């Protein structure tokens, strides 16, 4: 019989309390809040430090351990099909909502009065985003460079090739596979140690956000923010909820299952900060390692539902606020551009803004200087983006695993009904076994 851990030891409660304290500190002592930014940055950097090796271990172990290579291609194909369909729905929903609600109408902003210098860095980065450049960037110049830069897609590509090669070696490659499995357990132990700092990271990041931008500064653009948050909520409950119901599970129970990861993302505004834990959690939920290893990392570039909603809403909002004409032809062009450009966003803070800059440049008639309008609130909107992205990737993993019949449905039902035990165990490290890493 296991005893329930005290409430104060729950990561969920710790992060929630830390976020609350961070908001209060940032509001009443803004200068102190701004000075705490390194706490949030440091936590995210610690997470990023182990993402590449964890993806490598998970993908290689999953692919090398499969019976047939055909199933890898099948999983990847189904995943990309799902990503394209759902992200397109997200783009269309964002476009419909912003046209119906018209949050930017009546602002009559003169583009010449905007401070374009504040968005110059984003516009420059966005100008470099091309389809060919994105595809070529998936191929790393060197293996070491891919791991050093922490580029998820580059690491994923090398990991898939490594897994295929190891699979072809058969029993000869077994010692290497065993070593990678052991290395994975070490990496997940490191993640467990880092996660003990999650409340500190969330506290620092939230204190900085409120201290830097202030709650009062949100009033003018609060309408757009409210529309965006409500749209994301409806997307999760209606669209993703409908997908979940069609596949025999509840999105509400899934959200409860990943509640700790959602709070970490809420504090850091980066869905990437929860990636290592998501790999372990989705495998423990019943999805095979090979599916989790392909769907989750790939989804961080190809299945960003929250970012897709944000991109269409923000682009049309800028057009409305600056009285720029957006007829049906312009909006279809915008949608087509975003179908490609949105795949270049990563699950890190600020990437959505860079893709938005690229989109405004590509569409042509939309003023890039209009980005200055939403620069101040982008940081606040990033929370909803990141949370929606995380839930979207969790749903995608379960759905794709069910499609390729690599999901333990009994385990899925059991874990969701129980709400999922905390991933971080409070027992001494010596007593922890395989449970700390991905489920075997």
From Swiss-Prot:
GO terms for biological process: L-aspartate transmembrane transport. PROSITE patterns: NA_DICARBOXYL_SYMP_1, NA_DICARBOXYL_SYMP_2. It holds the Pfam family SDF. It is a multi-pass membrane protein. The chain crosses the membrane at residues 7-29, 49-66, 79-101, 143-165, 186-208, 221-243, 291-313, 328-350, 355-377. InterPro entries: C4_dicarb_transport (IPR023954), Na-dicarboxylate_symporter (IPR001991), Na-dicarboxylate_symporter_CS (IPR018107), Na:dicarbo_symporter_sf (IPR036458). The keyword Metal-binding does not apply. One of its GO terms (cellular component) is plasma membrane. Its main location: membrane. SUPFAM superfamilies: Proton glutamate symport protein. Disulfide bonds: none annotated. Residues 419-440 are annotated as: Disordered. It is found in: Cell inner membrane. Keywords: Cell inner membrane, Cell membrane, Membrane, Symport, Transmembrane, Transmembrane helix, Transport. GO terms for molecular function: fumarate transmembrane transporter activity; malate:proton symporter activity; succinate transmembrane transporter activity. Responsible for the transport of dicarboxylates such as succinate, fumarate, and malate from the periplasm across the membrane. Belongs to the dicarboxylate/amino acid:cation symporter (DAACS) (TC 2.A.23) family. This is C4-dicarboxylate transport protein. The lineage of its organism: Bacteria, Pseudomonadati, Pseudomonadota, Gammaproteobacteria, Pseudomonadales. The gene is dctA.
């Amino acid at each position: 019989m296991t005893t329930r851990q005290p409430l104060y030891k729950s990561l969920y409660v710790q992060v929630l309390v830390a976020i609350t304290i961070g908001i209060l500190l940032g509001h009443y002592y803004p200068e102190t809040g701004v000075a705490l930014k390194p706490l949030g940055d440091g936590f995210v950097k610690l997470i990023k430090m182990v993402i590449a090796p964890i993806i490598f271990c998970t993908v290689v172990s999953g692919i090398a351990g499969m019976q047939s290579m055909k199933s890898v291609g099948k999983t990847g194909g189904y995943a990309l099909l799902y990503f394209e369909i759902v992200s397109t729905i997200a783009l269309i929903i964002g476009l419909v909502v912003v046209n119906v609600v018209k949050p930017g109408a009546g602002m009559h902003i003169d583009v010449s009065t905007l401070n374009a210098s504040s968005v110059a860095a984003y516009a420059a980065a966005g100008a470099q985003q091309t389809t060919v450049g994105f595809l070529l960037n998936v191929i790393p110049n060197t293996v070491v460079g891919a791991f050093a830069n922490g580029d998820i897609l580059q690491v994923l590509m090398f990991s898939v090739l490594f897994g295929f090669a190891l699979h072809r070696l058969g029993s000869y490659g077994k010692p290497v596979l065993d070593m990678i499995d052991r290395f994975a357990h070490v990496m997940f132990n490191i993640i467990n140690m880092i996660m003990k700092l999650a409340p500190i990271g969330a506290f620092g990041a939230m204190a900085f956000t409120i201290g830097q931008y202030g709650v009062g500064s949100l009033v003018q653009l609060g309408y757009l923010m409210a529309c965006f948050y409500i749209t994301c909520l409806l997307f999760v409950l209606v669209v993703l909820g409908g997908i979940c119901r069609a596949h025999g599970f509840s999105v509400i129970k899934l959200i409860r299952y990943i509640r700790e990861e959602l709070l970490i993302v809420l504090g850091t505004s980066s869905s990437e900060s929860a990636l290592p834990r998501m790999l372990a959690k989705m495998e423990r939920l019943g999805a095979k390692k090979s599916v989790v290893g392909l769907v989750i990392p790939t989804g961080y570039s190809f299945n960003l539902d929250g970012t897709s909603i944000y991109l269409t809403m923000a682009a049309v909002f800028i057009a409305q606020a600056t009285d720029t004409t957006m007829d049906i032809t312009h909006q279809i062009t915008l949608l087509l551009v975003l179908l490609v450009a949105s795949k270049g966003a990563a699950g890190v803070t600020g990437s959505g803004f860079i893709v938005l800059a690229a989109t405004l440049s590509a569409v042509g008639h939309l003023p890039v200087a209009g980005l200055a309008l939403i620069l101040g609130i982008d940081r606040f909107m990033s929370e909803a983006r990141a949370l929606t992205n995380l839930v979207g990737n969790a749903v995608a993993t379960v759905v794709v695993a069910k499609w390729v019949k690599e999901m333990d449905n009994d385990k899925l039902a059991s874990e969701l009904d129980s709400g999922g035990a905390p991933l971080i165990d409070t027992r001494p490290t010596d007593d922890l076994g395989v449970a700390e890493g991905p489920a075997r």
